[in-house]
Amino acid sequence: MSAAGSNAVGTAIAFRGSHAAVHRSLISKAADGVQISASGVMVAENLIETRAASPGDHNDAIQLLGSPKHITIARNKILNRNPQTSCLYLAGEHIEVRSNYVSGGGWTIYGGASNNGKGGAGASDVAVVDTIFGRDFFEKSGNFGPVTYWNKANVWRDNRFSDGVTIAP
């Protein structure tokens, strides 16, 4: 159920138990595509897209919540047509984001520094590598830009806009 109380899906897939994967799936028509609060999770080769926001929704295509560990997000197409929230909301430890196509959200990626502005240690041992930032919905990939709350101690390498322009965090 969405925040607006309609019959719309709030979260398509929620990982609460460890050592699971979603692979080669279409995940759509939900406010949040995938929520991960478990460890040892892989999300690979999927199309993940949020639906248009209903009043009260807080749409994220992929959310890492709490302190998940050993998460891999690879070779997905991740879309959030909404001008708020994100495609990827990162938290936890040992997070690998590689070879994805991401586009949309307020900020396309919330990088996890300072727990995305909520205080505390935030995400650590994060690598975002070889990811393409599309401009499907907004000129800067996200409505406000491609990335925010990035911890410079983490790895950011070979990330670019779809036209090849390099993105620095």
Locations of regions flagged by a protein language model:
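Extracellular beta-strand/beta-solenoid scaffold signature
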Residues: 5-14, 28-35, 55-65, 81-92, ...
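Right-handed parallel beta-helix
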Residues: 1-5, 16-32, 39-53, 69-81, ...
